[in-house]
Amino acid sequence: MSTPFVTTLSPSLHGLLKDRLEEKGFIFTQPQHTIFQARSPSVSCTLYNSGKLVVQGKGAQEFIDFFLEPEILLTFTHNRMEKDLRPRLGVDESGKGDFFGPLCIAGVYARDAETLKNLYKTKIQDSKMLNDNQILALAKTIRACSTYDVMILYPEKYNELYAKFHNLNLLLAWAHATIIDQLAPRPSGEVFAISDQFASSESVLLQALRKKSTDISVIQKVRAEQDIVVAAASILAREAFIHTITKLEQRFSVKLPKGASAHVKSAGKTILNTQGKEILSLVCKTHFKTFYEICDSTDI
C-alpha cells in the first residue's frame, strides 16, 4: 500500500486501538504531536493528538481489511444488525492471535425464524466488543436457544495440527469446515453458512469443505460478525477460550496473559525458567515468533 490510509478516530476508540495493538505485539513510541505510534515489521500506525490516524507500510491493506475496519472503525451493536430471519449457520474462532491458550472454533445453527428472533432479543454482538463477564452470560442464552458445536484445540493438539498443515489458514479452514459439516442439515436445502473470510482467497475454506459430506453453500466475507449468528458463534468460541485458558492456568500454576504483548513474552520467560520448555510448549502456540524469542533470550 503506497498511499497512507488516513482517518479520524473517535476519542472513545483510542484506548481500544492501543489495547488491541499491544495484544498484537506492536512496539510503541510517542513522537511529537502524537498520542502514540505503534509499529510491527510491516505496519506503522500513528495516532495524532488531533485524532488523525495514519496507517502505512507493506502490510497496511491487510491490517485495514482484516483488523482496523472490522474490529475498530466499524464497531456495532445488535440494534444495528439487520434482522434477517433466514435459517443459517454461523462459524467463528477465538484465540488465533493469542500466544497462550487454545484455538477455539464455534458454530451456531439458527434453524428457524423463532430461533433468530430469540437471538435478536439479546445483546449479542461481536465478542471482541464484550468483556469476559458479558461473554459468559450471553453464552448461556445462546446455548439455550440454538443448536451449536464447539471445537477446542488445546496448545498440544494445536501445535500437532500446525506441524501437519504448516499454515494457519489451512488449519482454520479444516476446523471451520469440520464445524460446518457437524451442524449442517442433510440435505441443506435453503440453509446456508456464513464465515469470516480469514484467508485472502475464498478457495481455502471451499477446498476444505469439499472433503466433507455436506452440500451447504457458504458465504465468506470480511466483518461477518455483523451477522447475528456469526456474532453468536464468536461468543461461544470466546467463552471456550476463557474457560480453557483458566484450566491451563490452574493445571500448571501459571498466569497466561491474553494476546501477544510484552507482558506475554515476560510470562513466557518466567514459565521457561521455572518449568522448562516442555511445559511452555503445552500452554502456547509454538509457531509464534514469540516462542523463539523467549527460548533464544533465556538461559536454561
From Swiss-Prot:
Binding-site residues for a divalent metal cation, renumbered to this chain: 92-93, 196
Main location: cytoplasm
Segments forming domain RNase H type-2: 86-300
Keywords: Cytoplasm, Endonuclease, Hydrolase, Magnesium, Metal-binding, Nuclease
EC number: 3.1.26.4
Annotated compartments: Cytoplasm
Swiss-Prot/TrEMBL cofactor(s): Mn(2+); Mg(2+)
Function field: Endonuclease that specifically degrades the RNA of RNA-DNA hybrids.
Record protein name field: Ribonuclease HIII
